[in-house]
Amino acid sequence: MKKITFVFMFLSSLSVFGQIDLVPDTVRYQQKTGGAIDTFDISIADLPSTFEGGISTLSLNGLSTNSLYQDLSSRKFQRFTKFDPLKFSAIPHLGFAYSFGGQGSQFVRLDYSQAFSEHFLFNLKYDRNAGLGYIQNSGYSENNLRTQLQRDAKGYSFQLKASFQSWDLAHSGGVVNSTSNYDVIDTLGLEFAAINKTDASSSVKLGSAFLKNYFNFSSDSLNHFGLTTHHHYTITNREYLETDNLSAIYSSINIDSSKTRDQFNWARIRNASGAYYSNRKSQLYLDALIEHGYWNFQNLGVNRDTNEISFTTNARIRIKDLVLTNETRLNLIGGFNEWSEEAKLKYKNGKLKVVAGLVLKNSAPDPFQRSYFANNFSYVLSSIEKQTALKVGGNLNWNVKDSVFNFVVSGDFNSLSSAYIFDGDLWRNDSLNSFSFGSVKAKAHLALGNFNIMPTLVYSFDNNGYLPSFQAYTRVYFKARLFEAKKLEAVLGVDASYTTKFNNRVYVPAMDSYNMFVAPGENQTNSLLNLHAFATFGIDEFRFYVRYENIGYFWSDRKINEQFGFPISSTRLRVGLTWDFFN
C-alpha cells in the first residue's frame, strides 16, 4: 500500500472566511493512528488502576495539576471530552486501534476523515474503554463518539460538531479498610478483598451539539464582514442505584432504607447572533454577539429552570510569527453577572515554539451544587455566591537538532478562591475553600543511533498536598529496522517512574464527587517506584505491540492506596495493534 501524506489543519473555529483562526497551522507527516511507533503503545490505553471506571490515578496525567483542577471544580464522570482539531486528508482515511489485556480490559479507537471537496470536511472519532476491574464490583464501560462537519465557502460557511458519551459503572466504594482485608490482598490477591459496596452502579450520558454559521456580505476578497450565529446544546443525565442496609452506611435516609435510585437531568441551550469582521491580509478577526441561554435541571421529577442573557466577543491577530487570541464572556441578566476571560499566545520561529495561556473565571455554582434531593443527600444553598478560578500556563518546545534532541519545558499556576467544594454532605463556599497549586515540567527526547531516552521531570506545589512534590518518568528503548529489506521496524524498551508521597482524595460514588474536607495527611499514598516493559513492531500501515505493566507491584507494599480505599493494582499483560486504511 503506497504511502499517503496527510495535511492536518488545526482549526479553532471555522474557515478563513469568517473565523478566529484565519490562517490555520498546517503540518505534513505520515499519518499513523496512535502517533509515532516510539510511543503508540501508551497513547491508546490508560495504565492499570483499581479506581472507579479503570481511570489511572497514578499516571502522569492522573497526578497532574489539570486533573486536580477538574476534581475540585467538576464531577468525576460528567466531563465533556474536547473535540480534536479538524483534519483534512486528500483521500478518505480510516484509522483503527485495538488493545486488550488482563482483567477483561479492552480499548478501541476509530478515526475517520474524509474531504468531500477541498472546502467540505467530515471527521468522526469513536473511543471505547471497558473492563471487569481488579476488585469486586468494579466493571466499567465507556463510549465516546465525536463528529465534525465543516463547509468553508465565500458566501456561507458553517461548522457543526456533535458528541455522545456514556459511562456504565459498577461502584465498589473501594476495599474495606482493615488490616485483615489488606492481608487477604497480600496473600490471595485483589479479587478476594472485601469491598464497601456489593450492589451499587451508575449510568451517565452526555450529549452535545454545536453549530456556527457565518454569512459573508462583502464581495471584497480580503475584507469580510457579515452575520454570525452560534448555537450550543448540551445535556447531562445521571442515574445512581444502590441496594444495601443504607441506614448503616449513610446518616440520612430520605426515601428508602434498602434501595436507592437517584437521578437528575441537566439540559442547556444557548443561541447567539452578532457581527464579525476579518481581514485576510492582516489576519485580524473580531466578532461581538448577544446570547440567550436557557437551562433546565430536573431532579427526581422536580424541575428548575432559568433564562440568561450574555455578551460574548472573540478576537484574533497575527503579527509576524506571533498569534494572539482572546475570548470574553459576560452575563448581563439571569446568571449572577458571571464573566470569563481566556487569552492565548502562540509563537513559532524555526525550531522554537512557545505557547502561553490564561483563563480567568468568576462564576456561580452550577444547578447540581445549588440544590439536590436524593435518597441519602439533600441540600439547598441559602445564598448564591460567586467563585473565582485562575489558570496560567505555558510551554516552550525547542527542537535542538532534528531526529537527535528535542526539549520541552512547561509550567502552570492554578488558583480557586471561595470555591464550592463537597464536604461529604453539601457544597460549601467559605474563606477556607481556597486552593492554589502548580507545576514545572521538563521533558526531552535524546536519540543516539538506535538508543533513545525520553525523560520527564515534574515538580509540583499544592497547599493541600494532593499532588506529589516530585515525579520522574523515563522511557528507555532501542529502535531499529530489521532484516535485509529494512521494512520491519522494531522497538524494545522499558518505562520507569518514581513519585513521592501525596495525600489521598476520598471519592463518594453517590455524588460522583470527592470529599475534599477529609483532613490532609490523614490518608496518604507513599512514594512509589514502578516499571513497565514493552516491544512494538511495525510494517507500513500495520503495527503491533505487547506490554507487561505494573512490574513494580512485585516489590511495592500492597497496603499502599492509589486513592483512599483503592489499593495499587497488580500486573497486567496487554497486547494491541493499529491499522491505517486509505481510500
Question: What are these regions, as identified by a protein language model?
Answer:
Residues 18-79:
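N-terminal periplasmic/intermembrane-space "pro-region" immediately following the signal or transit peptide
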Residues 98-102, 116, 128-130, 164, ...:
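Short, flexible loop/turn elements at secondary-structure junctions
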Residues 136, 158-215, 236-248, 256, ...:
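Flexible loop and strand-edge segments within Gram-negative outer membrane beta-barrel domains
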Residues 99-101, 105, 129-148, 196-206, ...:
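Outer-membrane beta-barrel proteins
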Residues 106-128, 137-169:
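Transmembrane beta-barrel wall of Gram-negative outer-membrane proteins
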Residues 66-70, 76, 80-113, 133:
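Short strand-turn segments of transmembrane beta-barrel domains in outer membranes
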Residues 18-26, 207-241, 258-583:
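Exposed, low-structure sequence patches enriched in small/polar residues
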Residues 4-16:
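Sec-dependent N-terminal signal peptides
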